[in-house]
Amino acid sequence: MSIASKVYQALAASKPLCRLLHKDRRGCGIYHGRSPDAGSYPILVYSVISDVPALSADGCEMERRVTVRLHILTKDGAYERIEDAARKVMDSLGFRRYQSMELAEKHAFVKIMDFKTGTGVEE
């Protein structure tokens, strides 16, 4: 199973997180890459932004470092509870928060968080 699939399954399975997000016909507002309908908030968008070798031996990649980025989009900037719930999910997957930033767009407030983990190649 890919890292993106594992992240989606864990985020979507989190009832505390899903209760805080907009519901649509597909379920709670969790999307990979981008949101198909940016008019309904709050939503969470995730993507794998980096997957690089971290350890190699005898020309074989033994471990890699993966970075997943979460965007929390809200109309009112109240994303603290969503952030806490998402961090708990990412921590349970072995990811650790690397950096975060806040943006104000024309129609939404955005909280961006990057999470990193190391993983064996065979996983």
Feature-to-residue mapping (PLM):
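Short, low-complexity, polar/charged sequence segments that are solvent-exposed and flexible
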Residues: I49-V52, E63-T67, K88-S92, G118
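Oligomerization/assembly interface segments of phage tail-like spikes and tubes
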Residues: M62-D76, F109-T119
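Charged low-complexity stretches with an acidic bias
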Residues: T74-D84
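Small/polar-rich, solvent-exposed N-terminal microdomains that initiate assembly or binding
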Residues: M1-D51, L55-S56
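Residue-level signal for secondary-structure boundary sites
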Residues: V52-A54, A78, V121-E123
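Acidic-leaning, charged glycine-interspersed low-complexity segments
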Residues: E83-E123
